[in-house]
From Swiss-Prot:
Name listed for the protein in its UniProt record: UDP-N-acetylmuramoylalanine--D-glutamate ligase
Record-level Gene Ontology MF annotations: ATP binding; UDP-N-acetylmuramoylalanine-D-glutamate ligase activity
Classification via SUPFAM superfamilies: MurCD N-terminal domain, MurD-like peptide ligases, catalytic domain, MurD-like peptide ligases, peptide-binding domain
EC numbers for this chain: 6.3.2.9
Amino acid sequence: MKICLVGYGKSNNELLTKLLKSNHEIFVSQDKDFTKTDEIYFKKNNIQYETNHNDLLKNCDLAIVSPGIPPNSKAAKIIFENNIDYTTELEYSWQNIKKENKKAVFIGITGTDGKSTTTSLIGHILKFADPLTFVGGNIGVPLAKASETLNYYVVEVSSFQIFWSKTFTPEISVLTNLAPDHLNWHKDLNDYYQTKAKLLLRTLKSGGVAVVNEDAVNLLNLKDYQASERIITFSKNMIEGNYIKYKDKKIQVNNKIFELDIFKEDILASAVTTLNLGISEKIIEEAINSFKPLKYRLELIKSKNGVNYYNDSKATNVHSAYNAYKSFRGMHYIAILSGIPKNEDLTPLIEELKTYAKAVIVFGEMEKEVKKYPLNSKFIFKNNLEEVFLYLSEICEVGDNVVFSPAGASFDKYKNYEERGEHFNLLVEKS
């Protein structure tokens, strides 16, 4: 079989090492130049490669598509017009694991926000119960890296991965929440929502369980399963003090992150999912209470001169940033917005900040978008993060919280949200 890796990011890079051990003919195609290191590697292993998606892609039997490649791209057009079979690294790896290990249980986590935290927390709980657990997917570790002999596979799944996968079906699908996002990639909001729904529908049709945020159920086309006991919903109504109540079970949460509104749904989804996997309340409690937030997800970086610095660089959309800032209502906080907007309505975020923030500092591409809305005197505009920190040194007082939850993609000034987060941390140390 002629297999073409379309795009050569982390996931396809990892998959290539496995494919080289197969009898397939492997090509690599992407729309930009390869690094010299990549080219040396390809030549050493007799792998044909091309830029600008031409003959190699057109003549393959199977295209393994990097998730970020949009459906209106040149590569997608070639795939669709030539009726080339397609898949993703995630789906291809899942199929291979299932062939070798039919008892493997897959938990797929999707949603607009909280995917990475929920994936990490479910994985953290399951590792307490069973060390033979893999945690990865869109969160950063490709499934191709996993051994085929594990019991649990906890994978974050993006809407892009769902779009390019035809059959990937976890035993349990988890939907953290839904809000407008990636409208520069998907056709429209309904297309984005129904792409997310596909993962849940596949699980339900195969006899599996869908764990769904109660607020999102009506936004999805799940009518045929609405009354099904296999749709399990969770909501903040399940919280009583520092307890989560689910059916006849109670989980006591003493982790400080439970005090922040933004993490509550992630913890609820994780507790409900693992309870339905038969994990004991005691293990779930121990795991939740020892869990630490992911890097750049409303992470407390430092308390310095009476000021707390929170890094939420991973907040690349309005919904995520809104929920982060909402967690600081009633406290003195300074908000920092930046990045490239995603065709979203900023109104709820702007109104939240106008009402509750002490000051709002905006830099980067976000400035043009923010200035389209009615603002008040709290909004200040700077050219870069260094200028932001100079201004912070003038206005910060004891008891303030500096919250960097940008609400936009990082690509205006940074390679990714991690690089943006690292820059913020560096400036906190220097300040």
